């Protein structure tokens, strides 16, 4: 599941090109691995992407990133329980992922949208917006990230309202624990 700033580009295809979403994508693209324990097939993701010019980078926290001159690929998993600062090993994918809070909000009710000509799964726009509003104040000492999260949330909420889908935000909000 693609998450993060790249979703805004996908939401443009989901809502239609006339939606006034500004898409300032970052160089990194985040992939949420929703249910790591359910992965049945082993795929060595770093080896697969190595053929495309990606290099494995071991981040200071122990999780890996795949770096290309034009793109950085990161893998995230929902943090469970009390959480930990340690990476989550996903041997069936050949990666270590970073666990972050509240990502479980993004794994339910995903949509399919077109991103750079490829059909991908991404969080429902309502879940994306609520998640951004939830995490923005938690980005202590990073005011530019806080503002970016709030701006993205407002833009997506406006697109939902413009398409008569604001009730979906209420439904997502009501389903939150």
Segment roles from a protein language model:
Residues 1-177:
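Compositionally biased terminal segments of proteins
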């Amino acid at each position: 599941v693609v998450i993060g700033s790249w979703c805004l580009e996908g939401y443009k295809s989901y809502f239609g090109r006339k939606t006034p979403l500004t898409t300032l994508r970052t160089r990194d693209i985040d992939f949420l691995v929703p249910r790591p324990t359910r992965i049945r097939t082993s795929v060595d993701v770093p080896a697969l992407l190595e053929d495309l010019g990606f290099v494995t980078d071991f981040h200071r926290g122990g999780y890996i990133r795949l770096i290309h001159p034009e793109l950085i690929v990161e893998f995230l998993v929902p943090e469970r329980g009390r959480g930990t600062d340690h990476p989550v090993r996903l041997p069936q994918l050949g990666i270590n992922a970073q666990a972050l809070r509240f990502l479980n909000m993004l794994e339910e009710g995903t949509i399919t949208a077109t991103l750079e000509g490829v059909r991908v799964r991404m969080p429902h726009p309502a879940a994306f917006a609520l998640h951004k509003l939830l995490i923005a104040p938690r980005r202590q000492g990073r005011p530019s990230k806080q503002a970016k999260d709030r701006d993205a949330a407002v833009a997506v909420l406006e697109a939902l309202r413009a398409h008569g889908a604001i009730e979906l935000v209420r439904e997502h909000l009501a389903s939150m624990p």
